[in-house]
């Protein structure tokens, strides 16, 4: 892909919600080279995103003419923008980076977390999937453990912010909107994200199991997840239990986390980062590290709208620019 001009790339962001807004701010913050930035949605309108006013265009095939990178951050499913329009964007020369779940498990589509499997970008055919928010922060922490010690089993419980449900989730917490969650979210914890399948797993739990195996290239990895929505605005937290391939010492684990890409770690095993501290930051924070034999327990938090969505997507584009693939 040799689309860089003297002035940068033409970017399209499909979706003007929370993730779309964070994409604008991350592209600016990370100084991604932009010649033109288009915001597209179902209907034309003027919106303010990241402190800028944008004339939103209609997301339709011709809107992708001349686009180099198209970030999809809108509705998922059969009627979603990516399913309807990703192929149209690709046929016009764009590389599509999709934040939704529609293509993540497609064998022909790389599912990317750059700190973990950037090399998988070599095989893309114009469409790249951004991982689920809760999966992303987990695999950022699992990958260095896998490299150092090997992985046998993972058990994770999540505590996920309402912004993971979009503006509707925020409104449910702040204004009492009652059509977003199956039970009241304010002052509560809901151990159901998505719907429950025949296997007893929720939609979110299944994503974590299947996506982590694909990203880590460990198709047989034993992963057990329980995902919970909590009344926090931004920032997902996870309690993770890992069985590794050999007995380890605490000092070894601290060294691994302290040198791993994408991880923010104070160096103190007893440190306890919280969603409030992670909000607005692009890294994955780790703390409460405990070791017994071949078992490692730890806590991680990350901004679900940044590393869990927008930052990871922009990192993918940066990787493509660097590699020219």
Language-model segments: which ranges?
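Charged docking surfaces used in two-component/phosphorelay signaling
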Residues: 70, 162-325
